[in-house]
Swiss-Prot record:
PANTHER family: 40S RIBOSOMAL PROTEIN SA. GO terms for biological process: translation. Belongs to the universal ribosomal protein uS2 family. This is Small ribosomal subunit protein uS2. Pfam families: Ribosomal_S2. The lineage of its organism: Archaea, Thermoproteota, Thermoprotei, Desulfurococcales, Pyrodictiaceae. HAMAP family: Ribosomal_uS2_A. One of its GO terms (molecular function) is structural constituent of ribosome. It comes from the Archaea. One of its GO terms (cellular component) is small ribosomal subunit. NCBIfam families: uS2_euk_arch.
């Protein structure tokens, strides 16, 4: 698996860069596929715009932000990290991420007061949160901002970034994209923490993080 998902030096736009996984892995998972809308802040992460108006994210910047996010999150006590996904496709990736890292997953609806009301039985007091989509997970983002909790967010071209402290530019709507991104983030955090060697992958492939669509 290390050869299949290991770091790779590639030339993009005339520059040689080292990516956390081979470029074709990012591309086949659709991590670079944005939307037909791009907010002002997200323009800095755009590689090009297709003739049909679809914004394409710059994989180099995605890769760079994944490294930054992993180093940042590795500094926190795992039990004080909360990862959130209201949307269905992000729920299994979040659960797998939390299983490996040892943090708390909140999937499905975010109950009001989760981060702000200590009298509630579901109250949680994290030191940092990771959200899968700032729009869908806006309740978590808003409450974290009110409490001064840093927010790391997987952010697509159409997302606004108010109250987001660290943006990771990705396709945050695709099953395969979310699986690969959370897999990479998990691996890099564990490497930063010294829990796995720098040249070692997770025991499961990214597909294990992917939401499974039920066939009827």
């Amino acid at each position: 698996m290390s050869q299949e998902y290991g770091r790779q030096q590639v030339e993009i736009g005339g520059k040689v860069v080292e990516l956390l996984v081979p470029l074709e892995r990012y591309l086949s998972a659709g991590v670079h596929i944005g939307t037909h809308i791009c907010t002002a802040y997200m323009r800095k992460f755009v590689y090009r715009v297709r003739p049909d108006g679809l914004y394409i994210l710059d994989i180099r910047k995605t890769d760079e932000r994944l490294r930054v996010a992993a180093k940042f999150l590795a500094r926190f006590e795992p039990s004080k990290i909360v990862a959130v996904s209201v949307r269905q496709y992000g729920q299994r990736p979040v659960q797998k991420f939390c299983t490996y890292i040892g943090c708390k997953a909140i999937t499905g609806r975010i109950l009001p007061g989760t981060f702000t009301n200590p009298s509630l039985e579901w109250y949680v007091e994290p030191d940092v949160i990771v959200v899968t989509d700032p729009r869908a997970d806006s309740q978590a983002v808003d409450e974290a901002a009110r409490m001064g909790i840093p927010v790391v967010a997987l952010t697509d071209t159409d997302n606004r970034v108010e109250n987001i402290d660290l943006v990771i530019p990705v396709n945050n709507k695709g099953r395969k994209s979310l699986a690969l991104v959370y897999w990479i983030l998990t691996r890099e955090i564990l490497r930063e923490q010294g829990k796995i060697p720098q040249d070692q992958d997770l025991p499961e492939p990214p597909e294990a993080f992917e939401f499974k669509v039920r066939r009827h």
